Curated annotation (Swiss-Prot):
GO terms for molecular function: proton transmembrane transporter activity. It holds the Pfam family ATP-synt_8. PANTHER family: ATP SYNTHASE PROTEIN 8 (PTHR39937:SF1). Its main location: mitochondrion. Disulfide bonds: none annotated. It comes from Protopterus dolloi. This is ATP synthase protein 8. GO terms for biological process: proton motive force-driven ATP synthesis. Keywords: ATP synthesis, CF(0), Hydrogen ion transport, Ion transport, Membrane, Mitochondrion, Transmembrane, Transmembrane helix, Transport. One of its GO terms (cellular component) is mitochondrial membrane.
């Protein structure tokens, strides 16, 4: 049963996580989203408050 000998499985797990953290994570985080949710102007966004009849 392989779960009784954690030596090779732990090494595989450790190497795969180090590969992910050291190589793949900076490549993934270097991508930026172009869709910034900042409004163009705050003056046009004024809306009257809603009427909540059930409150």
């Amino acid at each position: 049963m392989p779960q009784l000998n954690p030596g090779p499985w732990f090494n595989i797990l450790l190497i795969s996580w180090l590969t992910f953290l050291l190589i793949l994570l900076p490549k993934i985080l270097s991508h930026k989203t172009n869709n910034c949710p900042t409004p163009q102007s705050q003056d046009k966004l004024f809306l009257p408050p809603w009427n909540w009849p059930w409150l």
